[in-house]
Amino acid sequence: MTGPSTGPALVVGLGNPGSEYERTRHNVGFLVADVLAERVGDRFAVHKKSGADLLQARLDGRQVLIAKPRSYMNLSGRPVAALARFFSVPPTEVIVVHDELDLPFGAVRLKRGGGEGGHNGLRSISSALTTKDYLRTRIGIGRPPGRQDPADFVLKPFAAAERKEVPVIVEQAADAVELLLRVGLEAAQNQLH
């Protein structure tokens, strides 16, 4: 999807299910999916064949599926691949929205493919889709302070100062996803980066 596409797209917000994870850094993808759902005025329903919460919408006439896997982050690949197969969405039209340790807090970046950077949700998706050639909306959460284990850091809530900024960052990430869907990767990167 370098230029705008007309086929169906699958937008996947990554996170962990359960109230104990709701406000953690690792769940920022779920927050973006929720904002996109609000914007199209719809609610998620369980898609039993995939094991994901799903809503179907139209953006400028294009079918857009917005999903939140109901599995834990490390097992996200199975529901993503099931949705892509069920709705005939090629991996190149899958957009995964996720937290990114390697970006400063609040940065939003778009890219296609590349490594997983230790992100087990991405690793699971790459394995299930049998390719890394899918789109990513990366939301910077920064690095853990001191010697804190990154695995612990991503499962902690945002710090008090960060919490005030999260709603704005989530809106910016949702804007980036919509722009990507409208104009394609290259044009969206040129506008955002």
Curated annotation (Swiss-Prot):
GO molecular function, one term: tRNA binding
InterPro entries: Pept_tRNA_hydro, Pept_tRNA_hydro_CS, Pept_tRNA_hydro_sf
Top class in the EC scheme: hydrolase
Sequence positions that bind tRNA: 21, 72, 74, 120
Pfam families: Pept_tRNA_hydro (PF01195)
Keywords, ordered alphabetically: Cytoplasm, Hydrolase, RNA-binding, tRNA-binding
First-listed, main subcellular location of the protein, grouped into a coarse class: cytoplasm
Site label Discriminates between blocked and unblocked aminoacyl-tRNA, positions: 16
Marked site positions, Stabilizes the basic form of H active site to accept a proton: 99
Keyword Ribonucleoprotein (UniProt): no
Cited SUPFAM superfamilies: Peptidyl-tRNA hydrolase-like
Function statement: Hydrolyzes ribosome-free peptidyl-tRNAs (with 1 or more amino acids incorporated), which drop off the ribosome during protein synthesis, or as a result of ribosome stalling. Catalyzes the release of premature peptidyl moieties from peptidyl-tRNA molecules trapped in stalled 50S ribosomal subunits, and thus maintains levels of free tRNAs and 50S ribosomes.
Name the record gives this protein: Peptidyl-tRNA hydrolase
Organism for this UniProt entry: Nocardia farcinica (strain IFM 10152)
